[in-house]
Amino acid sequence: MIHPTAQIHPTSIVEAGAKIGENVVIGPFCLVGAEVEIGAGTILHSHVVVKGITKIGRDNQIFQFASIGDTNQDLKYQGEPTRTIIGDRNRIRESVTIHRGTAQGGSVTVIGDDNLLMVNVHVAHDCRIKNRCILANNATLAGHVELDDFVIVGGMSAIHQFVIVGAHVMLGGGSMVSQDVPPYVMAQGNHAKPFGVNIEGLKRRGFDKPTLHAIRNVYKLIYRSGKTLEEVMPEIEQVAAKESAISFFVEFFKRSTRGIIR
């Protein structure tokens, strides 16, 4: 079903069965598959390919040569009906690739709201990107990677399969990340190592001084106390009971399976 207010360039192909919402614009030479749903106000600028069981929300901008929802690169994939879901108000720049999920990984690749994926970013099968993340040019996420809110991934960085990157993390350009990165941390290198708290980013997002002080103290517990993570967790949980921002650490460590960067 194509909404009567949608604008579709005559050189584009929209297969029968696709659902195209109100005020959607599909520019020249695009291909939209039969099982695709595109929400109101979204713009496909030109030469965009959207395939598979893919749902795209409202007011997204998708630039030329982006490929969304196509077959993933997992060698175990046998054509199972898996999905790609993209939220609202994302900017997906030129030549970005976002692959559908696998049956082994929950069957869905998910991108939330208000994210910016710059030129040549690759998001592999079963990744989950939350909200307000920025992935700079040529950043690569392997399968099953999770990015929590407000993560910044520098250009030319690569993140290993199954890695979790906590909220408000900043990864410097050219980083190779093979283990989980706790919330609020700045990291860089091959392999990426932590080098402090993302103070400037947190200030820009309205974190007050007492909260920043609490986050710094937890960072010191994790990285400078000389204790194991198991030894410091009771202290972190005590702080989290009083300071909600610290609860991100507690939730993160419950999910972490690969160990954390050191």
UniProtKB/Swiss-Prot annotation:
<keyword id="KW-0444">Lipid biosynthesis</keyword>
<dbReference type="InterPro" id="IPR018357">
    <property type="entry name" value="Hexapep_transf_CS"/>
</dbReference>
<comment type="subunit">
    <text>Homotrimer.</text>
</comment>
<dbReference type="InterPro" id="IPR029098">
    <property type="entry name" value="Acetyltransf_C"/>
</dbReference>
<keyword id="KW-0441">Lipid A biosynthesis</keyword>
<dbReference type="InterPro" id="IPR010137">
    <property type="entry name" value="Lipid_A_LpxA"/>
</dbReference>
<dbReference type="GO" id="GO:0016020">
    <property type="term" value="C:membrane"/>
</dbReference>
<dbReference type="Pfam" id="PF00132">
    <property type="entry name" value="Hexapep"/>
</dbReference>
<comment type="function">
    <text>Involved in the biosynthesis of lipid A, a phosphorylated glycolipid that anchors the lipopolysaccharide to the outer membrane of the cell.</text>
</comment>
<comment type="pathway">
    <text>Glycolipid biosynthesis; lipid IV(A) biosynthesis; lipid IV(A) from (3R)-3-hydroxytetradecanoyl-[acyl-carrier-protein] and UDP-N-acetyl-alpha-D-glucosamine: step 1/6.</text>
</comment>
<dbReference type="GO" id="GO:0005737">
    <property type="term" value="C:cytoplasm"/>
</dbReference>
<dbReference type="Pfam" id="PF13720">
    <property type="entry name" value="Acetyltransf_11"/>
</dbReference>
<keyword id="KW-0012">Acyltransferase</keyword>
<keyword id="KW-0808">Transferase</keyword>
<keyword id="KW-0443">Lipid metabolism</keyword>
<keyword id="KW-0963">Cytoplasm</keyword>
<dbReference type="InterPro" id="IPR001451">
    <property type="entry name" value="Hexapep"/>
</dbReference>
<dbReference type="GO" id="GO:0008780">
    <property type="term" value="F:acyl-[acyl-carrier-protein]-UDP-N-acetylglucosamine O-acyltransferase activity"/>
</dbReference>
<dbReference type="InterPro" id="IPR037157">
    <property type="entry name" value="Acetyltransf_C_sf"/>
</dbReference>
<comment type="similarity">
    <text>Belongs to the transferase hexapeptide repeat family. LpxA subfamily.</text>
</comment>
<dbReference type="GO" id="GO:0009245">
    <property type="term" value="P:lipid A biosynthetic process"/>
</dbReference>
<dbReference type="InterPro" id="IPR011004">
    <property type="entry name" value="Trimer_LpxA-like_sf"/>
</dbReference>
<keyword id="KW-0677">Repeat</keyword>
<protein>
    <recommendedName>
        <fullName>Acyl-[acyl-carrier-protein]--UDP-N-acetylglucosamine O-acyltransferase</fullName>
        <ecNumber>2.3.1.129</ecNumber>
    </recommendedName>
</protein>
